[in-house]
Amino acid sequence: LHGRRFSNGRILDLGNKGPTLRRSDRLLQLAQGLRILHVGCCDHLPLIHEKRQQGLYLHENLCRVATQCVGVDTNAEGVALLRSTGFPQTYTPDDAPLTSVVDGKEQAYDLCLLADVIEHVGNPVEFLSGMRRYQFKRLVVVTPNAFRWRNSWPGGEAINTDHRFWFTPYTLCKVLVD
């Protein structure tokens, strides 16, 4: 990952052996009972209401299982919508608390979650460097996998038109260590 040895044909074992949890279920499991900072909490604005009705809205589900759930998003309209619908600890990046505050005491967040964010950012390394302003004990970054079966339609590319990048497990790790 640090570029000490070069290979133009290395095969990375992805560990895809046996049954696994759905990604959303695993994220809820990781957040259980923790103080979390959820970066990119708004999702795509047109999808929030629909996902909430279906019980699939990640930020809402995280807030149900976490001890504290602070949401951060660059979408000011989405932040306003969430605040008006029962999520008062939702902020734009400039207003977000850098630490978790519990009983008047500042503490590092237990978990900082970047779920489906990194693929939207023009400069992922710079963005991740900027995340250092927040205090957290653990960082979890998830993104759509470039290798997932839905992306391999014959003769076409299934895309989210807001994405700037596709990551593989290895290339995401390379960006994270930069």
Residue spans for each PLM region:
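Class I SAM-dependent methyltransferase SAM/SAH-binding core
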Residues: 41-100
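A conserved beta-strand element that flanks and buttresses the S-adenosyl-L-methionine
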Residues: 113
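Local beta-strand N-terminus motif with an aromatic residue
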Residues: 33, 108-109, 136
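A short His-aromatic
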Residues: 116-120
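Residues at the starts of beta-strands that form the adenosine-phosphate
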Residues: 35, 67-68, 138
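Short amphipathic alpha-helix with an adjacent loop that forms part of the alpha/beta core around
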Residues: 28, 96-108
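Conserved alpha-helix/loop element of class I SAM-dependent methyltransferases that forms part
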Residues: 16-35, 45, 52-60
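S-adenosyl-L-methionine-dependent methyltransferase catalytic module, highlighting the catalytic core
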Residues: 2-15, 20-21, 81, 122-178
